[in-house]
Protein backbone atom coordinates (compact mmCIF):
# COMPACT_ATOMS: atom_id res chain seq x y z
CA UNK A 1 0.00 0.00 0.00
CA UNK A 2 1.34 3.41 -0.91
CA UNK A 3 1.03 6.15 1.64
CA UNK A 4 1.88 8.75 -1.02
CA UNK A 5 3.74 11.90 -0.11
CA UNK A 6 2.97 11.58 3.60
CA UNK A 7 5.66 8.89 3.92
CA UNK A 8 8.24 11.18 2.36
CA UNK A 9 7.35 14.02 4.70
CA UNK A 10 7.90 11.83 7.75
CA UNK A 11 11.43 10.86 6.77
CA UNK A 12 14.67 12.71 6.19
CA UNK A 13 16.55 11.14 3.28
CA UNK A 14 20.00 11.54 1.77
CA UNK A 15 19.78 13.85 -1.27
CA UNK A 16 22.86 12.15 -2.78
CA UNK A 17 25.30 9.36 -1.91
CA UNK A 18 27.73 10.35 0.81
CA UNK A 19 29.15 9.73 4.26
CA UNK A 20 27.38 10.64 7.51
CA UNK A 21 29.85 12.79 9.45
CA UNK A 22 27.60 13.94 12.30
CA UNK A 23 24.36 12.71 13.86
CA UNK A 24 22.83 15.61 15.81
CA UNK A 25 19.71 13.98 17.23
CA UNK A 26 18.41 10.79 18.83
CA UNK A 27 15.13 8.87 19.06
CA UNK A 28 12.62 10.65 21.29
CA UNK A 29 14.19 14.08 20.78
CA UNK A 30 11.87 17.00 20.03
CA UNK A 31 13.15 18.94 17.02
CA UNK A 32 12.01 22.16 15.38
CA UNK A 33 11.54 23.01 11.71
CA UNK A 34 14.87 23.55 9.93
CA UNK A 35 16.86 22.08 12.84
CA UNK A 36 19.86 20.11 11.51
CA UNK A 37 19.52 16.37 12.22
CA UNK A 38 22.39 14.81 10.26
CA UNK A 39 25.41 16.24 8.44
CA UNK A 40 26.27 14.44 5.19
CA UNK A 41 29.59 14.82 3.38
CA UNK A 42 29.36 14.38 -0.38
CA UNK A 43 31.75 15.61 -3.06
CA UNK A 44 33.92 17.26 -0.37
CA UNK A 45 31.01 19.40 0.83
CA UNK A 46 29.24 19.14 4.17
CA UNK A 47 25.45 19.31 3.85
CA UNK A 48 23.26 19.63 6.96
CA UNK A 49 19.97 17.77 6.53
CA UNK A 50 17.20 19.48 8.46
CA UNK A 51 13.80 18.63 9.90
CA UNK A 52 10.98 19.72 7.57
CA UNK A 53 8.75 20.66 10.54
CA UNK A 54 8.46 20.57 14.33
CA UNK A 55 8.47 16.88 15.22
CA UNK A 56 9.60 14.09 17.50
CA UNK A 57 12.37 11.82 16.22
CA UNK A 58 10.96 8.28 15.88
CA UNK A 59 14.16 6.57 14.68
CA UNK A 60 17.70 7.31 13.53
CA UNK A 61 18.91 4.79 10.94
CA UNK A 62 22.53 5.91 10.55
CA UNK A 63 25.65 6.42 12.64
CA UNK A 64 28.65 8.68 12.15
CA UNK A 65 30.93 7.21 9.50
CA UNK A 66 28.16 5.35 7.64
CA UNK A 67 28.21 5.53 3.83
CA UNK A 68 24.70 6.02 2.46
CA UNK A 69 23.09 5.87 -0.97
CA UNK A 70 21.07 8.72 -2.44
CA UNK A 71 17.48 8.42 -1.24
CA UNK A 72 18.41 6.37 1.84
CA UNK A 73 16.20 7.05 4.86
CA UNK A 74 18.34 8.59 7.60
CA UNK A 75 15.80 9.76 10.21
CA UNK A 76 12.09 9.04 10.77
CA UNK A 77 9.86 11.70 12.34
CA UNK A 78 6.46 11.81 14.04
CA UNK A 79 4.53 15.08 13.95
Predicted regions mapped to residue ranges:
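Structured functional modules or segments
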Residues: 3-79
Amino acid sequence: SSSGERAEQSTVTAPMPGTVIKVLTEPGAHVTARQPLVVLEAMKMETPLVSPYDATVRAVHVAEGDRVAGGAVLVELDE
